[in-house]
């Protein structure tokens, strides 16, 4: 019991036994170094500019004229499936795969009369890359620095 009291008075840590003042001065090294190449940095910059353009285009759309129409008027076009069965089967012409492939922005550009005012779709992370999504960061071991050798 006296040993614990002495450790607390001296400021020693339990795991290493080093004085706390030494641990506070020591700046720990990172476990690994993340290197982001120039190509990846350019890709990140391009995705940020594309996101800004997408947001501007969504804000500039004239949605005010369409807000007065009832929501039942604005519906996606449907067509009958090619399968001939007793039940009528319908498919959306704008399927989920189209949304995931092109994003909401190009769907708006293709058929602006079909979609009502902007709503938060499940594909939000796919239509415009954000800070948290669609980043590619490669970790690479830093180059070893060689000391100059002297040849005689």
From Swiss-Prot:
Region called Disordered, residue ranges: 1-23, 60-89
Pfam family for this entry, one: CDRT4
Coiled-coil spans in chain: none
Organs and tissues of expression: Expressed in fetal skeletal muscle and kidney.
Compositional bias segments (type: Basic and acidic residues): 1-11
Comp. bias (Polar residues): 65-74
Protein name: CMT1A duplicated region transcript 4 protein
Origin species: Homo sapiens (Human)
